[in-house]
Amino acid sequence: SQTYDESKWAKAAAAAKDVIELAKTSGLYELYTIAPKIGTLDMYRPPVHPEYSTKDYPDGWANIDPLLSYKSNFDGSVQGSKNPELIFTRTSDGTGTINDWMYQALPRTISGNNRLCVTQKQVNAYAMNDGRTISEAANTGDYVTTGFTTEAYSENNPFLPAKVSLMYNKREPRFYASIAYNGSVWEAASASEPRYRNQQIFYYRGTEDGKQGFKEECPLTGMTLKKFYNSEDSRTDGGYVIEKTEMTIRYAEIL
């Protein structure tokens, strides 16, 4: 029925609470976390907080990598059977579906279909790295919509190489794990030919991956989905694509 019924929300909340209590008593479900590696980038970690920066998870974030802990759920870095965050999943059937989404998002430059886009509204929903909304950050000058980055791409600067709009600076880890924007780098590490690796992609009109004439094989919003992309993924000759797990229900969605 399409009739609004608040009791449905109550039932959903009660069911979610049951799962949370089950997780607490059985240890069956928990958020998937990864310890920070040596040299973990400060750029996508939350700013220093006097109470939480030095405490381990779940009381703080000192012992986790916030970006990889989230990204690994989607990009195939961890097998579904070994991920305590997953409640209901599909692997064999789901992998093909997810990798097809990824193919639709991959830039034409690296042999993708280059057709998937995300909306500005969705991008604006991602917070800053300190948890504030972009509107709140704009009031203090920490979120701007003019200007571009100037530092070259490197292992220490993977998300904001030169010529990227400053509106994408200091965003939360989930943003960098999920969204590709003008100037994002696609690693394609498994590509056999170096020319396909670490490609900085732009979607401006007239560029290889932008709109060309009447052709619309491009992200019309100038942004696409990178959520299910693994840095090793490449559909070029000699490359391979990591298998992913389709997660229908995650514990994070219950909390």
Predicted regions and their residues:
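Extended glycan-interaction surfaces of carbohydrate-active proteins
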Residues: 193-241
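A generic alpha-helix propensity feature with a strong bias for hydrophobic helices
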Residues: 50-53, 222, 252
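Extended amphipathic alpha-helical segments enriched in small hydrophobics
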Residues: 1, 243-255
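Flexible, active-site-adjacent loop/turn segments at secondary-structure boundaries
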Residues: 85-86, 173, 177, 223-227, ...
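Short secondary-structure boundary micro-motifs
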Residues: 161-162, 230, 247
